[in-house]
């Protein structure tokens, strides 16, 4: 059963415009191929403040997501140097 992909509004507004087109297509392909079919097999669980969330590595970029039943909520796509601090600010109320 394929998972439905949902994106945080900041992914399209803030994250994707910062990534060059070739890398963006590579990330999109990885999301479609891996997260839509088996997110727990391809992703790695995060710890500490991001416990309950997962990451998918695509080159120097990280896709941070959460699996909720049959949905995959993608919270951010950022360079590995800044992804975790940027995502943590999105989770604060």
Where are these regions (language model features)?
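Residue-level recognition of oxygen-bearing side chains
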Residues: 10, 51, 82
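A short, surface-exposed loop/turn module that caps and links secondary-structure elements
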Residues: 32-57, 85
């Amino acid at each position: 059963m394929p998972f439905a992909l949902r994106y945080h509004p900041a992914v399209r507004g803030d994250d994707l415009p910062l990534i060059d087109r070739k890398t963006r297509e590579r990330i999109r392909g990885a999301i479609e191929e891996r997260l839509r079919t088996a997110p727990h097999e391809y992703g790695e669980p995060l710890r500490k403040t991001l416990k309950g969330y997962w990451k998918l590595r695509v080159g120097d970029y990280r896709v941070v997501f959460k699996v909720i039943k049959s949905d995959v909520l993608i919270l951010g796509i950022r360079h590995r140097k800044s992804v975790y601090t940027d995502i943590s600010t999105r989770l604060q109320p």
